């Protein structure tokens, strides 16, 4: 078991803490490709400034345990197969959830690396 650090915007972190967000979608690259079931992720509470720029925020705001990792080709494939509300609780449809991811990750990168549905379980609020 390894312990990782990663940031989440405040609203998504709140969704994780109350159990609405149980699946984290990421490209299958970098540290996310190294995640394993049983690993712990210490989450930072990141925030956007008035210009919309994302900044690292409060460290150790919450901890989650990785309980499953599923592989998909694209984010649309992921949100069609997973409960999209467990991925993006604020989304009103599968298409809206996929579009949110498409704003961050190009289709080229999705096709190159593939996508991970990282199922998480909230374990503590340090």
Where are these regions (language model features)?
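Structured alpha/beta reader/binder surfaces that contact nucleic acids or chromatin modification marks
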Residues: 2, 6-126
């Amino acid at each position: 078991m390894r312990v990782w650090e990663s940031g989440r915007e405040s609203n998504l972190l709140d969704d994780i803490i109350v159990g609405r967000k149980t699946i984290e979608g990421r490209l299958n690259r970098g540290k996310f490709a190294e995640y394993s079931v049983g690993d712990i992720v210490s989450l930072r509470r990141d925030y956007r400034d008035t210009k919309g720029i994302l900044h690292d925020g409060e460290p150790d705001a919450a901890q989650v345990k990785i309980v499953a990792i599923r592989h998909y080709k694209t984010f649309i494939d992921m949100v069609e197969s997973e409960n999209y509300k467990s991925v993006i609780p604020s989304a009103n449809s599968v298409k809206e959830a996929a579009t949110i991811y498409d704003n961050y990750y190009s289709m080229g990168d999705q096709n190159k690396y593939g996508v991970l549905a990282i199922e998480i379980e909230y374990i503590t609020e340090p």
